[in-house]
Each structure stands twice: as C-alpha cells, then as structure tokens.
From Swiss-Prot:
Binds 1 [4Fe-4S] cluster. The lineage of its organism: Bacteria, Bacillati, Actinomycetota, Actinomycetes, Micrococcales. It comes from Kocuria rhizophila (strain ATCC 9341 / DSM 348 / NBRC 103217 / DC2201). It comes from the Bacteria. Its cofactor is [4Fe-4S] cluster. Its EC number is 1.17.7.3. Pathway: Isoprenoid biosynthesis; isopentenyl diphosphate biosynthesis via DXP pathway; isopentenyl diphosphate from 1-deoxy-D-xylulose 5-phosphate: step 5/6. This is 4-hydroxy-3-methylbut-2-en-1-yl diphosphate synthase (flavodoxin). InterPro entries: Dihydropteroate_synth-like_sf, IspG_bac, IspG_bac-typ, NO2/SO3_Rdtase_4Fe4S_sf.
Length: 388
C-alpha cells in the first residue's frame, strides 16, 4: 500500500504580483502610477459641441465612479467648447486628439487636465513633440501616448507585417524617447489592440522597457457582453502581474456601463474597495423560486448603496443556506418561503412575496449602521457587518 503524507498545506502564495513601480504623473487632481490607486476612465459619447449634454453625461459618469473622462475634439467647434467643459467638469477632462496637432495646443490652452495624442495619425507628429512638450510642461498638462493597432505607423506595419505586440511596443517606446529627449516626462502610455492576447503581450513587453505609467484598454472591444469578457480577461491577466495604472473598458454601450464594469474588475481583484455585491445562484431544476427575478429586484432595490455589503440570493436548500450564511445578508428560498440570514444567523422566515421587501429593509438598516473610513471601508471597532 502506498502511503500518502498529507502533512501541512503549503502557505498560500499571493494571487496578485506586487504593483509595478512606475513614475507618477497627475491628470488634474488624480494621480496615475506609483502608489496612486488604479483609476477608472471613460469617454463621452455626446458631441463635444453640445456642452450641456456633455456635462450631463460627465456628471452621470462621476456618479457611477468614473475618475477621469475623455472627450473627443475633432474640430475647431469642439475645441471651442473645451474651456467650459474643463472648467465645469467635476472630474479631470482629457481631450482626445487625432490628425490635427493644432487641437493639442487648443486643449492645453483650454485648461484640460490631459491630452491623448495618437502618434499614428497626427500629421508629422514626431516634428511636433518639442512644441507639445513645452506647452504641456508650462501648463502642467499630462499627455497620453495612445498607440492603437488601427492607426499604427506604416513603417512599422511594413516591418512586422501587421500590428504585432512588438510593433505596438516599438511605436510606444520610440515616441516616449522623443518626449524624454525634450525633458518631458509627465506622460502615460497605452498600446491598444482589439485582440486581448495581442494586447496583453504588448503591455508585458512595454512594462519591461521603462517605468512609464500604463493606461490599459482593449480597443473596439465590442458589444456589452463581448467587450466585458475581453476587457476582464486582459485586465485580469495584466493587473494580476502588477501591470496597469489606469483602465478604460471600451464597450458599444452607454459609457456608464464602462465605468461599472471597470470598477467591478478592480473590486473583484481586491484593487478597489469592495462595495455592494449580489451573490445569486445560476438556478437549476432544484430552484423553488424565480431566482432571476428575485436577484434582479434585490439588485435594483440596493443599487444606491455604496457600502461593502454582500447579499446572497439563493433558490434552494442545497447551497442556499451555506451561501446565505457566508454573506453579510442572505436568503435561502424554498417551499414558498425564505429564511433570512444576517451574519450567518437566521433572523426570520418570511413568505415568498415578502422576501424582497425584507431584504431591502434589512440591507438599508445594516448600511446605515456602518461607519466607513475615507476609503469606503468599515472602521475598526465600529458596528459593522463582517464580509463572508
């Protein structure tokens, strides 16, 4: 008989690698890189010339947890709208510039916190870097070198045949070296591709070449589901390796959805304070309640909460009681009723038609009792719930 020595389990290794050490830059009031929290960005979809609509969308993004917002600037009329938008926006504004270098200077003069430049399509960009560096330095404006697979320099496409990770990295490193030749260092870099595998490798190569802060993004990621999967896959790999200082989830969906997904990715990796989390079973033939409807009603009813609260909505007696006990608050449903758990203890059993009402009331009561620190986490010693 072969003996098996079970012994003591090995000490668990950290899931995430230490954060990559980079220089720090500022995008207005938001630090990017070094020890700054990883920020979430989005981009408005309104015409920038429609100042009121753009500011309204920025306000919605801010409320959803967006840290930095980007606005398009394809024309002089858009450039003329930037001063008001930059002044009235509650979060730092970055102007997105393509083709015309004059709009880089217009954005700097308008008071934007940052400018994104695309070296692949701005006319004679390399010749413009000295002037851009001086103007940005004088105004305290940071730059993003935004390399994109869809607009890569033709010389690199000829060299590599297509937008490979090496081509994206080489473009970024070249442009970074030109800015640094003019003693400008207040920039971050992105190397975006619509294929997450190519994008991941490009960022890994770039991270090996310098200490620049990196803006993560999968370009043209697609509709909500597809884009979420692509971004979560790519960001999860890179962030777990300590690579990435600010993120933008690109979706063919309202920009607020980009922010929600971005925040969820960071929270799932423990890189942003946990907030409301709904745990619900996928449902199966054992379910004795409409779990989909129940979970959606609870999620909608608690969407206003910003405290770290885990709520479990379970549809049967197999995993239901265990999951509900592990959550801060939960329900295990069956036989036309639901057992309500708080901190692992059953506090009451209610009829099925009262489950949602009871969970919402209990969750709000628990949220009100929480005392949170400046990072949105429970204060030690305060009357709080314990996360499962």
């Amino acid at each position: 008989m072969t003996s098996v020595n079970l012994g003591m389990p090995a000490a668990p290794q950290p899931v995430l690698s230490p954060r990559r050490k980079t220089r720090q830059i500022r995008v207005g009031s938001v630090g990017v890189g070094s020890d700054s929290p990883i920020s979430v960005q989005s981009m408005t979809t309104t015409p920038t010339t429609n100042i009121n609509a753009t500011l309204q969308q920025i306000a919605e993004l801010n409320a959803a947890g967006c840290d930095i917002v980007r606005v398009a600037c394809p024309s002089q009329d858009d450039a003329d709208a930037l001063p008001i938008i930059a002044k009235k926006s509650p979060i730092p504004v970055i102007a997105d510039i393509h083709f015309q270098p004059k709009y880089v200077y217009a954005a700097i003069d308008a008071g934007c916190a940052g400018v994104r430049v695309n070296p692949g399509n701005i006319r004679k960009f390399d010749d413009q870097i000295e002037g851009i560096s001086r103007a940005a330095e004088a105004a305290g404006v940071s730059i993003r070198i935004g390399v994109n697979a869809g607009s890569l320099d033709k010389r690199l496409l000829e060299k590599y045949g297509k937008a490979t990770p090496e081509a994206l990295m080489e473009s970024a490193v070249w442009e970074a070296s030109l800015f640094e030749q003019h003693d400008f260092h207040d920039f971050k870099i992105s190397v975006k591709h619509n294929d997450p595998v190519t994008m991941v490798r490009a960022y890994q190569l770039l991270a090996e070449r310098g200490d620049w802060p990196l803006h993560l993004g999968v370009t043209e990621a697609g509709p909500a589901l597809q884009g979420t999967v692509k971004s979560a896959t790519a960001f999860g790999i890179l962030l777990s390796q300590g690579i990435g200082d600010t993120i933008r989830v690109s979706l063919s969906a309202p920009p607020v959805e980009e922010v929600k997904v971005g925040n969820q990715i960071l929270q799932s990796l423990g890189l942003r304070p946990r907030k409301l989390e709904i745990v619900s079973c996928p449902s199966c033939g054992r379910a004795q309640v409409d779990v989909y409807k129940l979970a959606e009603e609870v999620n909608e009813g608690l969407a206003h909460l910003t405290v770290p609260l885990r709520v479990a909505v379970m549809g049967c007696v197999v995993n239901g009681p265990g999951e509900a006990r592990e959550a801060d608050l939960g329900v295990a449903s069956g036989n036309g009723k639901g057992q309500i758990f708080v901190r692992g203890e059953v506090i009451k059993t209610v009829p099925e038609d009262q489950i949602v009402e009871t969970l919402l009331a209990q969750a709000n009561e628990m949220a009100e009792s929480m005392e949170l620190d400046e990072n949105g986490q429970p204060v030690e010693g305060a009357p709080v719930v314990t996360a499962g």
